[in-house]
Every structure is written in structure tokens, then in C-alpha cells.
Amino acid sequence: MFESKINPLWQSFILAVQEEVKPALGCTEPISLALAAAAAAAELDGTVERIDAWVSPNLMKNGMGVTVPGTGMVGLPIAAALGALGGDAKAGLEVLKDASAKAVADAKAMLAAGHVAVMLQEPCNDILFSRAKVYSGDSWACVTIVGDHTNIVRIETDKGVVFTQADNAQEEEKTSPLGVLSHTSLEEILAFVNAVPFDAIRFILDAARLNGALSQEGLRGSWGLHIGSTLVKQCDRGLLAKDLSTAILIRTSAASDARMGGATLPAMSNSGSGNQGITATVPVMVVAEHVGADDECLARALMLSHLSAIYIHHQLPRLSALCAATTAAMGAAAGMAWLIDGRYDTIAMAISSMIGDVSGMICDGASNSCAMKVSISASAAWKAVLMALDDTAVTGNEGIVAHNVEQSISNLCSLACRSMQQTDKQIIEIMASKAH
């Protein structure tokens, strides 16, 4: 139907968004280990009795302090146990969506019995690595995930190797829809958003549905640090204005509260992260409601936000010391600016100001406090948009911001790729010392 109207570049953009914007139940690093455990358990006939798991330092960092949905418990061991005992290996990032109350109870009992061990993989050259080895009687199965949260590269049992990705890995890399992001630009992304048929991108409205539901849940319950509901109370006390800026702050942080606090609702993720998906979605939704945008305008704004966030994050490691809520919020800035103004220059100025503002915020692991980073990133995005609407932005004479937005993005990402690697090691060392 509309495929005939879409040129190959635009089709690649759509495929990239479909690849990177997916539903995810629970923080994606523990969920990656849960998926490995579920896939391993699926290879066994008997009941899983014991689990040994190994993860990369970055995955350990992002799994130590976050609540696993439906369990009320924090950390990687409960994720591995519930994945093995109640997970659906075919559900990807929603591996735990159908876990029963009995599976949760059995997983907790397995932990209490000391039958789950999660260790650092040493040495480990992969930023994202999870391996689960599950045992049932004399049988065992082991599944390894590398590079991406759901990318299973090896399945092995006591009877031999069942699957290995090594043979077709190079071919898969060539056909990845994300390859187009290495040689495109924000201008091309904006041209796509302005002209692509609505029906081709209607699917992105699911992000508003899922992340909007998370936001509502965050305001209903006392999830995580309950930042969103706390700020509502302060509005009622007269300590915060009830305006658009506050609405962006409250509704975005509420979604992250629910996400990190263990609510059993999926987030629409971006680049493998629920919080990045929330940050790229909710601020745009709030502004769209404020300006009275219809579904088509909302879809175009969300597509610009999510694709811009993916485009920027594609220049980063999958996990790093840089808090990627900041880069997702750069996408949100683009989407919000488009809704109000629509011009490329306004969008570029907003992103440049974001880079001059929140760049360098560290990622010290997934936890309830992510909602604070999400909220400050969303607020910074709106501030940058307001500045751009007044033809004001951080200029190329200041800090790491360059005279064009593409170079500014490159400068920011080079920090995470090179200079912040030592920062990441120090963060992991500090967090590991607290665990002993």
C-alpha cells in the first residue's frame, strides 16, 4: 500500500525505529539475564534446581539496584530465578510478563536456599554480556547473550552445542537496519518526519499508549521515589506552579517511578532502555496535548523524538558512564520543538543547548533514582526548546558545543566512547565496594 511511496532511506528509518522501540517489562539489564535463564530453562525437561550466572561489569552495574517487576525484590539473582521458573523465552524483553504468583514464590524460595549465584564475567570485553547456566538433576543448559539485551549468541546443554550465532553474525551485521544511521543526518530525519505517510508511522502511537499508562500508574501508587506524586502534592501546596513545564516534569518522572519501582506494566523502550523510551515519549505527549495536536501530529513528533534519540545513541556504546536519559531527552527536545515551531534551526538549537546543559551526567546503575535523572533531562529539554523559540542557544564558542549540531553530537558521544571509560570503571568499583 504505502510502501510504494516510501524511498529506501525512509524505509530504513522505519525499520530502525521498529528495531529499537519495543515494549519491555522491567529494567532491561536484569531482564536480559532473565531472558538468558528462561531460554536455558526451555532446553531442559525437568524443574530448574540451581542457577549460575555471569554478567559484564556494566550489566552488573545496571542490575544491582533495580526492582524486578512483580517481585518486590531488587537485583539480578531474583531476575535470573524468575526467568528460569516463570519466564517466556519467546517474549524477548517481556520475558516476565506472564510469570505467575507461584513462579515468584518459587523464585524467592530458590534464592533463600542459596541456589542462585550471579558473578562477574572475568575477563569480559563485552559491554553487554549475560550468561545463565541452569541445572535440573544431572542435566544442564547454558545460554549466552552478547551485545544487545536479547541477542542470544550461544545455547549449549550437557548433550552439546544447540545453537551458535558465530556463523551468521557478520551477515546479520550487514543487514541491520541501524546501519543507515552511520551516514544520515538530523536534516534527513526531519525531512522524513515531515513527509512520510501517516499510516507508515502510526505504530509509534503505541509508545504514547504504553508510556502514558506507566505515567498514570506512577501517579496512582507510591512507586520508587514517587517523584511524580510528590511534585503533585507540592503543586497543591502552592510550592510549584501548575503549568506546562511542571506537567512535563511530573508526568515524565511518574512514568520512570513506576518503571523503576517494579510496576507490572511494560514501557515502550528506546535503544534497549525503558527510561530512554519514557524520556523520548512523555514530554512530547504533554506538549502535544497542550497544543491540541491530533494523532498524526503526535505520531510525527514521536517519530522525530525516537528516531533522533536512536540516531544519537547509535554513536554511543550500548551501556556507558553517560546517562542516556540525556540523549533521549535531546530527541524529546526535537519532538517538542517540531510541535511548536517545526523549523530545523529551532530543533538544532534546542539539541545544542541540551549538549551544553546536561552532558556529562553519569550513569551509576539502574535504580529508583533514575527517575530523577529522567525528570531533570526532560526539564532541560523543555528549557532548551523555550530558548530556541527565542532564537537563543548555547553557541559553538562554548564548551563542547560546536558551530553545527552534528559536530556537537559527535563531541558529546566521543566523551562516552573514550574519556568516560575510566569514569565507568570507577563507578563500578564504588558500587561493588558497597555490595560487600
Curated annotation (Swiss-Prot):
Task: Give TM segment ranges.
Answer: none
Q: Which Pfam families does the UniProt record give?
A: SDH_alpha
Q: Which domain of life is it from?
A: Bacteria
Gene Ontology MF terms = L-cysteine desulfhydrase activity
List this protein's GO terms for biological process. L-cysteine catabolic process to pyruvate
Coiled coil (residue ranges): none
Q: Do you know which PANTHER family this protein is assigned to?
A: UPF0597 PROTEIN YHAM
Checking HAMAP family in the record gives: UPF0597 (MF_01845)
- Which family does the UniProt entry place this protein in? Belongs to the UPF0597 family.
Give the protein's recorded name: UPF0597 protein YhaM
Q: From which source organism is this entry?
A: Salmonella paratyphi A (strain AKU_12601)
Q: What does UniProt list as this organism's lineage? A: Bacteria, Pseudomonadati, Pseudomonadota, Gammaproteobacteria, Enterobacterales
Gene name of this polypeptide:
yhaM
